[in-house]
Amino acid sequence: MEASFVQTTMALGLPSKKASSRNVIVERRNLITVCRFSVKTLLEKYTAEPIDDSSEEFVNFAAILEQILSHRFKACAPAGPASWFSSDGQRGFWDYIRLACSKVPNNCVSSIENMENISTARAKGRAWIRVALMEKRMSEYITTALRDNRTTRRFYDSGAIMLREEATVLTGMLIGLSAIDFSFCLKGEVLDGKTPVVIDYTPYLKFTQSYDYLTDEEERHSAESSTSEDNSPEHPYLPLVTDEDSWYNKWHKMEQKFRIVYAQKGYLEELVRLRESQLKDLEAENRRLQLQLEEAAAQNQREKRELEGVILELQEQLTGLIPGDHAPLAQGSKELTTSLVNQWPSLSTLHRPEGASNSKLYRRHSFMSTEPLSAEASLSSDSQRLGEAKRDEEPWGPIGKDPTPSMLGLCGSLASIPSCKSLASFKSNECLVSDSPEGSPALSPS
């Protein structure tokens, strides 16, 4: 069954993979060759005068360039937003040029996009070809587009001219077009964006006759030459260039070639001068930025040294202030502790017989730490003397407003009846505080 399928395929002449690959190679070679011929024709005929749309050679060149840019262009768009398509629903090489040439400085892409009389992608592509030729930047546009390999592979299938080394040859050929002045009027003119272009190959086809075959006229000429007594040439069918017209034609062709080469030489010299001026400007800008960088580095070092000196000075001041601050804090802490202990009431003021004793029991954990109260070490001596007078003369509890409001919570908690009832239940963690009028009672475990 497989053999019959292969025979059927061969009989129908279906293209195989090898034949398809050959077709792609032949297409690339044909397009590049005919493009070279077209560029040479333009350079020979229109070096001294501008070219417009009425020139048949330009129309053919534009068709060739459009075919090259459309060679193996992907028909279906990759995944993306719907607005990515052109307005006519068809994709053309303009979609590729619009993205790949957007990085060209001062490009004409936005101008073509804003043209009101051009709507289809094919018409915009043809308008771009004309504008790029008038700007003499066609080679620059194609070179920039080829550098964007990711975008190029996104729009073209394998085997396309834009993905092969022929694209580099194309950019080299397009450089010579900078010697020609193109003049097109796109304002108000509606470019045809529906009809496909057709390349005219007839101006570039030339039949070369073999030496083995002679026409009747050449045979007759050979016979006449053989009967004459004059010396005949080695190949009688090749005419000798002996008349003045032939020499004049040769001279005219050489003059045209010289003009073309001279125009290209002038363009390249101008381009070199432009690049040299740009290089000088960049070198001057580089030197200026280098000086700014050095100045910024020196200023940074100066500021760093100044900040280091400030840090060292602050450290010295801090070191000198630390020893003088500890002594007042420690002394104030001791005075505050003494005043707090002396202000606690005796048990006789509670008027309970079971609590009558010359000593009071307090839990060790009920003492408030002096560290949180160190901020109050600056209490006035009047408040301390007032606390000592109240210890011997009256029961605990302020008659008026206590000048030490931070002690009210502690006084209330110790003077309450439930706290006095719980004194008998204190155990191993209790301590005795003497009710004697001495300055600071000694603490001793029970």
Curated annotation (Swiss-Prot):
GO terms for biological process: positive regulation of cGMP-mediated signaling. PROSITE patterns: RUN. Residues 372-384 have a biased composition (Polar residues). The modification Phosphothreonine is found at T215. Residues 52-189 form the RUN domain. Residues 385-394 have a biased composition (Basic and acidic residues). GO terms for cellular component: intracellular membrane-bounded organelle. Residues 267-322 form a coiled coil. This is RUN domain-containing protein 3A. The gene is Rundc3a.
